[in-house]
Each structure stands twice: as structure tokens, then as C-alpha cells.
From Swiss-Prot:
InterPro entries: DNA-dir_RNA_pol_omega, Pol_omega/Rpo6/RPB6, RPB6/omega-like_sf. It comes from Mycolicibacterium smegmatis (strain ATCC 700084 / mc(2)155). This is DNA-directed RNA polymerase subunit omega. Coiled coil: none annotated. Belongs to the RNA polymerase subunit omega family. SUPFAM superfamilies: RPB6/omega subunit-like. Keywords: DNA-directed RNA polymerase, Nucleotidyltransferase, Transcription, Transferase.
Length: 107
């Protein structure tokens, strides 16, 4: 499956005379590029509101992981299957993209 980002990498590799098989050996980066920022911006009134929304949810996810050892279940864990060593912010952005959270701005 080809993505615009991967196509741009291959075109840049061709322009520089680099073997395209080496350029395509790297995985497409995750995080802010997946899900795409343009799709995330439709879930909030501004990019600043999106940052606050994602940061609050990432903090909840981080607190959830920290409380597991104590046996306290005050916070809700990830609503999507987290990848190996995936950061709480990346998990939060995927939850926002999947419309798995209810959010009222200003709270």
C-alpha cells in the first residue's frame, strides 16, 4: 500500500540517486502523521484545542498505567489497542481520530 509520504520519500530518493529499495525499507512514521493532522483538526475547533484535548487524555492514560501497580482503578485505560512502546499521546490521538471520546471544549 502506497501513501503520499512514502511516495514523496521514493521520489526524493530518485532525485538524489539513492537506491529506492533502501528508501522504502523504513516504516511510515506513526504519531502525528498517523492519524493525519488534517483529519484530527476536524475533531476540535482549533489546533490549540486539539493539543489540550489530546494532552489531557494522554495524561489520563499515563496515570492509568502508573496506578496499575497500586491496584487502584481510578482512570480509564486506552480505548484502542496500544502498540508496543507506543506513547500515551499517540494513543490519545488515535482515540480522538476514532471518535472514541466525548469532549466538551473548555472543560
Amino acid at each position: 500500500m502506497s501513501t503520499p509520504h512514502a511516495d514523496a520519500q521514493l521520489n526524493a530518493a530518485d532525485d538524489l540517486g539513492i537506491d529506492s529499495s533502501a528508501a522504502s525499507a523504513y516504516d511510515t512514521p506513526l504519531g502525528i502523521t498517523n492519524p493525519p493532522i488534517d483529519e484530527l483538526l476536524s475533531r476540535a475547533s482549533s489546533k490549540y484545542a486539539l493539543v489540550i484535548y489530546a494532552a489531557k487524555r494522554a495524561r489520563q492514560i499515563n496515570d492509568y498505567y502508573n496506578q496499575l501497580g497500586d491496584g487502584i482503578l481510578e482512570y480509564v485505560g486506552p480505548l484502542v489497542e496500544p502498540g508496543l512502546q507506543e506513547k500515551p499521546l499517540s494513543i490519545a490521538l488515535r482515540e480522538i481520530h476514532g471518535d472514541l471520546l466525548e469532549h466538551t471544549e473548555g472543560e
